[in-house]
């Protein structure tokens, strides 16, 4: 069981006598733009204990957020207006790491790790392989190094990973698998790297709970009325250490929440 050290966490609630911790992940596709579409209202209503976002596309001095009760951590890309992650945490962590400790990967603001007494929370924005798989070779190196990073954390304590991992793992995870075979996000190579991760002591929470659920997507192209037609991809995940599977209460895709081309995903765990 995942032990929540502070029973007074605001927003955590009792579930058959256990404290439920709520974690949300959302690729906001530009935090400032998303704020104009209701991000803060959703954030306050969600009342999550941990809230990880990806593609912030800003430097911390470009935004001022008044979020009482939250500690805020940014990891911004050196290239302005690109990539970036942030975590909003009700409980101050024991430590915070930015990046994965490998220089070639740590200039784009892709990973933030918060350490708590009983687990690590990792917020990640995985590099896109890009059109014609131009960045696939780099993506493969990233996958290998990031997997080793997660495995090293997992040796110390359980891991909760969330974020836009930029891959639809199986055919059930996107609307049009045949048409997208070997496109970025659905190449054989990227899918195999996800398989390798899940064979390394980790679990895709949504598929663990809902192995046969179809039409469950987290990203839709802005083109061709894709969201209206639900022609999407499931590329935003919660991945947890296998040891935490028995602690999961639910994992929910909040597809009705707009403001980005992605929607939030919520994990409830005790």
What are these regions (language model features)?
Residues 5, 9-67, 77, 82, ...:
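N-terminal, active-site-proximal structural segment of metallo-dependent hydrolase catalytic domains
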Residues 21-29, 118-130, 162:
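Active-site-proximal beta-strand elements of phosphoester/diester hydrolases
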Residues 27, 43-61, 121, 150-171, ...:
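Active-site beta-strand/loop signature of hydrolases that rely on acidic residues for catalysis
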Residues 57, 62-129:
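Structured beta-strand-rich core segments of catalytic domains in phosphoester-bond hydrolases
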Residues 71, 142-231, 235:
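Metal-dependent phosphoesterases centered on the DNase I-like endonuclease/exonuclease/phosphatase
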Residues 80-95, 223-246:
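Conserved beta strand-loop-helix elements of the APE1-like EEP
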Residues 90, 114-117, 241-242, 267-270:
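Active-site beta-strand termini and strand-to-loop segments that position acidic
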Residues 101-102, 127-143, 178-183:
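Surface-exposed cleft-lining segments at the edges of enzyme active sites
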């Amino acid at each position: 069981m995942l032990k929540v050290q502070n029973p007074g966490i605001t927003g955590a609630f009792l579930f058959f006598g256990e404290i439920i911790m709520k974690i949300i992940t959302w690729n906001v596709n530009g935090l400032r733009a998303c704020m104009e579409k209701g991000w803060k209202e959703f954030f306050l209503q969600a009342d999550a204990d941990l809230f990880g976002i990806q593609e912030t596309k800003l430097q911390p001095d470009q935004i001022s957020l008044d979020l009482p009760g939250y500690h805020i951590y940014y990891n911004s890309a050196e290239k302005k207006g690109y990539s970036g992650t942030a975590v909003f945490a009700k409980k101050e962590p024991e430590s915070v790491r930015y990046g994965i400790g490998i220089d070639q990967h740590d200039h784009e603001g892709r990973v933030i790790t918060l350490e708590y007494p009983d687990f690590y929370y990792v917020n990640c924005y995985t590099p896109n392989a890009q059109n014609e798989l131009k960045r696939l070779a780099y993506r493969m190196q990233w996958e290998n190094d990031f997997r080793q990073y997660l495995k090293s954390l997992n040796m110390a304590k359980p891991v909760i990973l969330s974020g836009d991992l930029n891959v639809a793992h199986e055919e059930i995870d996107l609307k049009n698998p045949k048409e997208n075979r070997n496109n970025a996000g659905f190449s054989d190579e990227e899918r195999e790297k996800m398989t390798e991760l899940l064979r390394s002591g980790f679990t895709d929470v949504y598929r663990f709970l809902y192995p046969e659920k179809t039409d469950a997507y987290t990203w839709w192209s802005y083109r061709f009325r894709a969201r209206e037609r639900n022609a999407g991809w499931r590329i935003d995940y919660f991945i947890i250490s296998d040891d935490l599977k028995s602690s999961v209460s639910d994992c929910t895709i909040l597809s009705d929440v707009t403001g980005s081309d992605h929607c939030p995903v919520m994990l409830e765990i005790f």
